[in-house]
């Protein structure tokens, strides 16, 4: 069944088939997303959704990368300080996406963004304009996002340690 399905995919959608094979090794992911200025990828959570964006930087976890969803106008977020950026990140309609290299992502040409009504409405011209703005401020934005993630991770570790200590004290008092 798998072999027949792959043959069918190769015949009907060779672009997708080749893109699926291209990033099977996680070491190939970073060079690809750095090389492609604007690209599409998909994410699935109950339904599959296409994204069009660009690479921002590496996250605090190895093999995890920040991607910027170009649906969001970067002018709205680039001037924000870290606290306001934290707030903005927590809102729905996430514009910062995480790409995990060990998930064999499928990176496609930006032309596939036009299959989505929002991107079609924005248009290539505006998408390119937004990309150029992100490219210009990539390092600064990546740095701010890493600081936010480091704080979150530290808070989580502190919380976990406090819980372990509380459970340990509970257990000791029961003895």
Language-model regions: role of each:
Residues 14-17, 28, 32, 146, ...:
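Residue-level signal for secondary-structure boundary elements
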Residues 147, 151-168:
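Charge-dense, low-complexity intrinsically disordered regions
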Residues 38-148:
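A conserved active-site cap/scaffold subdomain adjacent to cofactor or substrate pockets
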Residues 1-25:
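Acidic, Mg2+-coordinating catalytic module of metal-dependent nucleases/exonucleases
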Residues 20-45:
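Short, surface-exposed recognition loops and adjoining beta-strand edges that mediate ligand/DNA contacts
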Residues 171-175:
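Conserved small/polar residues in nucleotide/adenosyl-binding loops
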